[in-house]
Regions:
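Proteins that catalyze or organize thiol-disulfide redox chemistry
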Residues: 1-52, 60-63, 67, 73-75, ...
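Conserved acidic residues
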Residues: 57
Length: 106
C-alpha cells in the first residue's frame, strides 16, 4: 500500500527517500482519482523495488498541496533526490503511466 504523505512525514518519506518517488495527489471525491487507484496499486506491486509509491490527499494535507502547487487532481509528481522532475495531471491508463514513469524517472 502506498505511503500516506502528511505535513509531518513528507521530508523523511519523500524528500529523503533513497528511491525515486511517485507521488499521487488525489481526493476522495474525485472520480478519475478513484479510477486510478487500482492502477496505482498494481504498479506499486510490480515496481516497488525500484520506486517509492506515495499518496497525498489534498483535503487532509492542504499545506503540502499548496507547497507543491497542486491545482487539480489527480496529479502525479515524479520526485528524485527531493526534487520534482516531472508532473502529470489527469487520469492515465496503466500503459500511459508506465510511459510517464520511464520518461521522468527512467
Amino acid at each position: 500500500m502506498a505511503i500516506a504523505i502528511t505535513k509531518e512525514n513528507i521530508d523523511a518519506k519523500v524528500n529523503k527517500s533513497s528511491l525515486p518517488v511517485i507521488l499521487k495527489v488525489h481526493a476522495t471525491w474525485c472520480g478519475p482519482c478513484q479510477q486510478m487507484n487500482p492502477i496505482f496499486e498494481e504498479l506499486e506491486k510490480e515496481m516497488s523495488s525500484s520506486y517509492l509509491f506515495a499518496e497525498l490527499n489534498v483535503d487532509d494535507a492542504r499545506d503540502v498541496s499548496i507547497q507543491y502547487g497542486i491545482t487539480s487532481v489527480p496529479t502525479l509528481l515524479f520526485i528524485k533526490n527531493g526534487e520534482i522532475v516531472g508532473r502529470e495531471t489527469g487520469y492515465m491508463s496503466k500503459d500511459t503511466l508506465i510511459d510517464k514513469i520511464n520518461e521522468h524517472l527512467g
